C-alpha cells in the first residue's frame, strides 16, 4: 500500500496543530483529518481520532506497522515543507508519484503543487 496523494490545509493558529491533511492510499482509499502537530520533539503527524466517553482519544484509522507509519509521516511532512510559502488556510496538494523511487528509502513527491 502506497500514499498516492496528500492534500493539506495549513492553519492560522497559535495552537500546536499546524495543519490538517488528507491522504489517498493506492489511488483508492482516502483518510481525512490527519493533523500536523508541533510536539515537544518537533513536528509529527497524528492520525484522526475521536474522544471516548471517558475523555481519552482513540485513533479512528492508523497504520499497523512502522513502515506504513513512516511512509505516511514522510509523505505528509514533505508536502508540509514544500508548501512553506503557501498562505495559511489555502489547500495545497501534491500527488505522490505512482512509481515511488525506493533508492535509499527516500519517497519522492511530484513537483506540481496546486494551491
Swiss-Prot record:
Domain of life: Bacteria
Residue stretches spanning the membrane: none
Swiss-Prot/TrEMBL GO biological process terms: division septum assembly; sporulation resulting in formation of a cellular spore
Disulfide links within the chain: none
Biased composition regions of type Polar residues, renumbered to the chain: 91-100
Region Disordered, residue ranges: 88-115
Bias (Basic and acidic residues) ranges: 105-115
Entry keyword Methyltransferase: no
Keyword Amino-acid biosynthesis tagged: no
Gene3D superfamilies documented for this protein: Stage V sporulation protein G (3.30.1120.40)
InterPro entries found in the cross-reference section: SpoVG, SpoVG_sf
Keywords recorded for this protein, A-Z: Cell cycle, Cell division, Septation
A Pfam family recorded for this sequence: SpoVG
UniProt-listed PANTHER family: SEPTATION PROTEIN SPOVG-RELATED
Role this protein plays: Could be involved in septation.
Family designation: Belongs to the SpoVG family.
UniProt xrefs under HAMAP family: SpoVG
Annotated protein name in UniProt: Putative septation protein SpoVG
Organism annotation: Macrococcus caseolyticus (strain JCSC5402)
